[in-house]
Amino acid sequence: TQPHAFRLRGEGGAVEPAALAQGTVIEVANLYFNTPARRKFLKSESTEYAHCDEVLRRMALARPDVAFSIGHNSSQKRRLASADFSRRAREIIGDDFFPQARALDESAGTLRLSGLAALPAYSRAGRDEQYFFVNGRFVRDKLLSHAARQAWADILHGARHPAYVLFLELDPAGVDVNVHPAKTEVRFRDAQGIHR
């Protein structure tokens, strides 16, 4: 721990001491001010904010013990106090999900799968409420998505999708997280064993 905070300005500034309560503040403004080619590919302000909020939601689900807040245009949009996992899941996904969700905690060898999975009555038209974490890291993985889809195959029909917040824990040597620059894709050493 340090007796004070530090500030680093991305405008070419040096690291300097700053006053701050305990925690971390990340502020982004004019990110592509000097790269107009990148700036022209940005979506609308509301779409870009929604992407930032989704990143916060994923981090908050992965770490319910940490408080999070997000602001936009000088106003606070979301504030989450540290909480247990159940409370955090309710805050992030909503009150409708929680009564339909069932806790699960299963182990097989060195694998452990835990989290919340919604009953078929809470199926979704999209994949907006599917959160899969591997060793605490949010991932989008075709293998895991397929395994989850198969688990609901006999009870979900048509274009409906299950809702879940699932955590897969395994030996870090059994998964390569350096597959995608954003670290949202992984490669498993024993993909068939994971899928079962």
Residue ranges of predicted features:
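N-terminal phosphate-binding caps/lids of nucleotide- and nucleic-acid-binding domains
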Residues: 1-196
